[in-house]
């Protein structure tokens, strides 16, 4: 019973309850537990390697670091200085290398891929905070999962990412069609970012 009440509280706080039918992301509040995988490749695009019943560091259900950007940053679950007492986890994104030309990148593959429709507007909301090293911005968009990396939409969150939790909202319009795109978040400077209660919906 306590677990059910906690999940209800989490859904209410993150705004997921009202968007349950339209939420496009998998594990948007980072509360989902990772499960060990035996004799299979982890990740929707074959990322990772074969495991013997254990998970490597940085595995968070629904979230990946795209190929080619693995050396620039790492992701992990954080349980400290959380957004609210109802939250048990947040995403810690430790960025060691990043610039405007070569930003650090993380992606969410959606529940069954993210359908992108040309001309449709999407809204991305998220809570974020940063350590004192991070002076950059956060950009977000929809990108092809194929090797060509086609961008269907992209926008940058307004305002600096501060030391205290703050909510940000980004809207963008898709410029192409894709049955199974992914949400991509980019950061253009080194530092540590914390994200929680993210949400992507189609308007």
Where are these regions (language model features)?
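Bacterial Sec-dependent N-terminal signal peptides
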Residues: 1-22
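Extracellular and organelle-lumenal recognition/adhesion modules and their flexible linkers in secreted
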Residues: 4, 21-203
């Amino acid at each position: 019973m306590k677990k059910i009440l906690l999940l209800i509280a989490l859904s209410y706080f993150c705004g997921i309850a009202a968007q349950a039918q339209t939420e496009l992301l998998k594990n948007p509040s980072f509360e989902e537990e990772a499960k060990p995988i035996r004799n299979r490749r982890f990740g929707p695009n074959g990322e990772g390697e074969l495991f013997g019943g254990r998970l490597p560091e940085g595995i968070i259900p629904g979230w990946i670091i795209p190929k080619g950007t693995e050396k620039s940053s790492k992701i992990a679950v954080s349980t400290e200085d959380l957004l609210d007492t109802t939250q048990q986890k947040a995403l810690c994104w430790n960025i060691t290398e990043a610039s405007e030309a070569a930003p650090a990148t993380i992606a969410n593959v959606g529940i069954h891929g993210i359908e992108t429709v040309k001309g449709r507007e999407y809204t991305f909301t998220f809570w974020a905070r940063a350590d004192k090293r991070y002076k950059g911005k956060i950009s977000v968009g929809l990108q092809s999962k194929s090797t060509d990396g086609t961008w269907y939409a992209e926008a940058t969150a307004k305002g600096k990412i501060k030391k205290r939790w703050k909510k940000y909202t980004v809207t963008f319009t898709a410029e192409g069609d894709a049955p199974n795109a992914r949400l991509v978040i980019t950061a253009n400077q080194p530092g540590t970012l914390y994200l929680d209660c993210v949400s992507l919906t189609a308007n």
